[in-house]
Design a protein with these regions (language model features):
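N-terminal glycine-/serine-/threonine-rich phosphate-binding loop
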Residues: 1-53
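Solvent-exposed alpha-helices and their adjacent loops that cap or buttress functional pockets
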Residues: 1-2, 21-23, 64-69, 89-95, ...
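Short coil/turn connectors at secondary-structure junctions
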Residues: 2-5, 25-28, 43-46, 69-72, ...
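ATP-dependent carboxylate/acyl-activation modules
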Residues: 3-8, 13, 19, 59-62, ...
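General beta-strand structural signal in soluble alpha/beta enzymes
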Residues: 8, 29-34, 49-52, 77, ...
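Glycine-rich nucleotide/cofactor/substrate-binding loop typically near the N-terminus or early
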Residues: 35-106
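A short, charged helix-loop
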Residues: 98-110, 117-158
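Active-site loops and adjacent core secondary-structure elements that bind or stabilize anionic groups
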Residues: 140-148, 152-194
């Protein structure tokens, strides 16, 4: 049986080292990319880098890191669907059981290069699949997440559903910041290309 896996990719690194350490102590594997992976490795945390799972290095100045079937398949597979699990096995993809992502505060320094695509995609994928996957977007939740995993062996369905709601609120807020930025550029950009 595979270990439980958490994918960590955070802008706000508050508490992430302790969180990862606790997960490892509970038998979890940590997957990470970019600045989060570097931060964890520098702190002595054993990390499986996303590039190891995808077989592809990040590209386009970091615009493409986690947008890959080996990541999203591992997040989106319905664990109660035998065909999903068989397909993952046939493709050599392992499940990802917990996605920990928080997004760059776009309103603080807006611009095209700071629009995150992969982060929101992972958050939304995990939230969609809350029956199988937990998603954490708030560092203040790390302690309660660890406590619940330690006590119950995993997150309850109720907790995963609450976290999914928080996740969709997080991505909605992020998207609203981007819309606001475009609204400020209204004179420069057309409302529609049609």
């Amino acid at each position: 049986m595979n270990s439980s896996r958490a994918l960590l990719s955070v802008y706000d690194k508050t508490g992430i080292v302790d969180f990862a350490t606790n997960l490892i102590d509970l038998g979890w594997e940590i997957v990470s990319s970019g600045g989060t992976a570097s931060h964890l490795i520098e702190s002595g945390i054993e990390v499986i880098e996303v590039a190891e799972l995808t077989g592809a290095q990040e590209m386009l100045d970091g615009r493409v890191k986690t947008l890959h079937p080996n990541i999203h398949g591992g997040i989106l597979a319905d664990r109660s669907n035998h065909e999903h699990l068989k397909e993952l096995e046939n493709k050599g993809i392992q499940t990802i059981d917990l996605v920990v992502v928080n997004l760059y505060p776009f309103s603080q320094d807006p611009g095209i290069e700071l629009m995150d695509i992969g982060g929101p995609a992972m958050v939304r994928a995990a939230a969609k699949n809350f029956h199988s996957v937990g998603v954490v977007v708030d560092p203040l939740k790390y302690g309660s997440i660890i406590d619940e995993i330690r006590e119950k062996g995993n997150l309850t369905l109720e907790t995963r559903q609450d976290l999914a709601r928080d996740a969709f609120a997080h991505t909605a807020s992020y998207d609203a910041e981007i819309v606001s930025w475009f609204d400020d550029k209204q004179e420069e950009l057309p409302k529609s290309i049609h």
